[in-house]
Amino acid sequence: MHSKPQWLRAKAPTGEVFNETLNIVKLHNLHTVCEEAACPNIGECWNKRHATVMILGSVCTRACAFCNVATGIPDKLDPHEPENLAKAIKKLNLKHVVITSVDRDDLPDGGANQFIQCIEEIRKITSETTIEILTPDFLNKKGAFEAIAVASPDVYNHNIETVPRLYAKIRPRARYFHSLYLLKMVKQINPKVFTKSGLMVGLGETKEEILQVMDDLRSAEVDFITIGQYLQPTPKHAKLDRYVTPEEFEHYKYIAYSKGFLVVASSPLTRSSYHAEEDFNRLKACR
C-alpha cells in the first residue's frame, strides 16, 4: 500500500465535543458511517457535532471492493431505529443531518420504508432539521427510491462511485446506468429535492472518463457533485492506483462548475457528507 502524502494526513479524533457526540451516538444505539467506514474526517466532523448516521444495521449484504463496512447476513430491522435517530438528532441539536445505510438486498423494499420512517420521525420530533439522505440503489426494486423521493428529503444523494469501465471490479453488483436512472427519476418525481452524487478518484480512471461521468450526471439533472480521493482500507480491498494532487482536484472543480453543477466539492479529503450542512446552505443560495 502507498504511503499517504502530507495533504491526506487528518488530525486524530480527540476532544470533549468529540466524546460527547460519541456518547450520544452510543446511548441511542446508532451506527455511523464515520466509524464503520473509517472516515478520515471523523475528528473534525464530530468536534462540530456532525455525524452521518447509518441505518438498517451495520452489516451490508454486498461486498464492494472499495468499502470497509462489514458484510454478511444482517440482523432484523430495529423498529425503534427511526425514533432513536430523531431523539439523538434533537439532543445533538443538528441543523442538518445526513442519513445513509448499508445495502439490504435481503429486504423486499431494500430498506426504503425505514428511510421514509426516519424522515417522518425527524420531522415530527425536530422539524427545523433539514434532511439529506444517501441511499443505495435498492437493487432496482420497484417503487423503492420513488417512495423516498415522494417523502421529500431536502437532499437525495446516491453515489455513482466510479467510472463505468471500473464497475465490474469496484461495484460488481451495481449498474452504472441504473444509478443514473435513479438520480434522474428522483428529480422528475420531486423537482424541489436537490440531487447529489459522489465520485472516487485514484482507482485507475482517466481524466476523460471523469469528465464523461460529469456529463452523464448533468444529463440526469444532478445539482451537486462530490469528488474525493479513494483510500484503500486494507490490503484485501481494491488496489489504490495513485494519489490525485490537490491541484488536479481544483481543476476538476473548475470543470464541474463550467458544466453547470450548482455546487461542487472536490478535494483529497472530500466525502459525501463532508461539510454537508455548509454545502446545503450553498445549494439553497443557488436556487
UniProtKB/Swiss-Prot annotation:
UniProt-annotated binding residues for [4Fe-4S] cluster 1: 34, 39, 45, 273
- Gene Ontology MF: a single term: lipoate synthase activity
Per the record, the pathway is: Protein modification; protein lipoylation via endogenous pathway; protein N(6)-(lipoyl)lysine from octanoyl-[acyl-carrier-protein]: step 2/2
Top EC class for this record: transferase
Query: Which reactions fall under this protein's catalytic activity?
Result: [[Fe-S] cluster scaffold protein carrying a second [4Fe-4S](2+) cluster] + N(6)-octanoyl-L-lysyl-[protein] + 2 oxidized [2Fe-2S]-[ferredoxin] + 2 S-adenosyl-L-methionine + 4 H(+) = [[Fe-S] cluster scaffold protein] + N(6)-[(R)-dihydrolipoyl]-L-lysyl-[protein] + 4 Fe(3+) + 2 hydrogen sulfide + 2 5'-deoxyadenosine + 2 L-methionine + 2 reduced [2Fe-2S]-[ferredoxin]
Its EC number(s): 2.8.1.8
Q: Where in the cell is it found?
A: Cytoplasm
Q: Which cofactor does it need?
A: [4Fe-4S] cluster
- Keyword entries, A-Z: 4Fe-4S, Cytoplasm, Iron, Iron-sulfur, Metal-binding, S-adenosyl-L-methionine, Transferase
Q: Where is the Radical SAM core domain?
A: 46-262
GO cellular component: a single term: cytoplasm
What positions does the entry give for [4Fe-4S] cluster 2 binding?
60, 64, 67
Q: How is the cofactor bound?
A: Binds 2 [4Fe-4S] clusters per subunit. One cluster is coordinated with 3 cysteines and an exchangeable S-adenosyl-L-methionine.
- Which family does the record assign? Belongs to the radical SAM superfamily. Lipoyl synthase family.
List the HAMAP family hit by this protein, alphabetically: Lipoyl_synth
NCBIfam families the record matches: lipA (TIGR00510), PRK05481.1 (NF004019), PRK12928.1 (NF009544)
Q: What is this protein called?
A: Lipoyl synthase
What organism does the record attribute this protein to? Answer: Wolbachia pipientis wMel
